[in-house]
């Protein structure tokens, strides 16, 4: 759902990134920010053209790896990755994509996408896997692409570091009930069966989901 409120900070990966993995942001209409030298430096070389959700990821030294609007995946040279088109996020989904590195892996990253709730599947949550060893180290989307987790999600999703400091919980609410779906991502892969929790009132269709730094609380901002 399109909103006339620019909350670009919330377009980006919404979990505690270690080291410098969140130091470069791409968002909006060809906009970006580089935080590697302390003060932010504006970037104008990005390829995104989106009013809402987007995500970027760097390596541990703050070097850009790739970024996405949930539909197209761009490598560090701003070219579309092999198999990097047709992901099932949406330019009018508030949290169209988040990126999570697979625990204990050097090359594999999960892109979790959320569709616009007004599309056919009503905000389907899907994931695709990027392998950074492909295309000469620039990365590519693997055959594990647009794997459905569940339908009827609101346009909210977040990732929370597990208490073991290695794994992640991927959390997203439905928009028709107060049910939150939580999937565990480990070095083995993503759990197929979610943990379901009914919490509070039914969330609004759009908005943002954010975890506290210690991972003990989440907040849903409705729009």
Model feature map: region roles:
Residues 1-23:
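Bacterial Sec-dependent N-terminal signal peptides
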Residues 12, 59-62, 176, 185-187:
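Short acidic-glycine loop/turn motifs at beta-strand connectors
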Residues 19, 49-61, 88-107, 149-167, ...:
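Structural signature of eukaryotic scaffold interfaces centered on beta-propeller domains
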Residues 20-94, 101-104, 114-140, 165-223:
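Beta-propeller domains
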Residues 26, 65-66, 110-112, 169-171, ...:
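Structural core positions within WD40/WD-like beta-propeller blades
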Residues 40, 142-146, 190-196:
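Predominantly a core beta-strand signature of beta-propeller blades
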Residues 120-169, 173-174, 198-199:
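Asp-box/WD-like beta-propeller blade repeats and closely related beta-sheet repeat scaffolds
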């Amino acid at each position: 759902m399109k909103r006339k409120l620019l909350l670009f900070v919330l377009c980006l990966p919404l979990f505690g990134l270690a080291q410098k993995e969140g130091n470069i942001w791409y968002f909006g209409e060809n906009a970006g920010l580089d935080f590697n030298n302390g003060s932010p430096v504006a970037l104008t070389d990005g390829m995104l053209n989106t009013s809402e959700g987007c995500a970027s990821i760097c390596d541990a030294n703050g070097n850009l790896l790739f970024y996405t609007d949930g539909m197209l995946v761009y490598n560090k040279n701003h070219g579309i990755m092999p198999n990097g088109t047709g992901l099932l996020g949406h330019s009018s989904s508030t949290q169209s994509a988040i990126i999570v590195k697979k625990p204990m892996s050097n090359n594999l990253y999960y892109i979790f996408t959320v569709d616009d709730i007004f599309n056919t599947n009503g905000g389907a949550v899907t994931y695709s896997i990027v392998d950074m060893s492909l295309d000469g180290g620039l990365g590519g989307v693997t055959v594990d692409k647009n794997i459905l987790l569940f339908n009827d999600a609101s346009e909210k999703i977040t990732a929370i570091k597990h208490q073991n400091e290695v794994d992640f919980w991927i959390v997203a609410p439905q928009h028709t009930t107060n049910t939150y779906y939580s999937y565990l991502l480990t070095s083995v892969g993503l759990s197929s069966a979610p943990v379901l929790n009914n919490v509070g009132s039914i969330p609004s269709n759009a908005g943002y989901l954010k975890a506290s730094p210690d991972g003990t609380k989440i907040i849903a901002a409705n729009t």
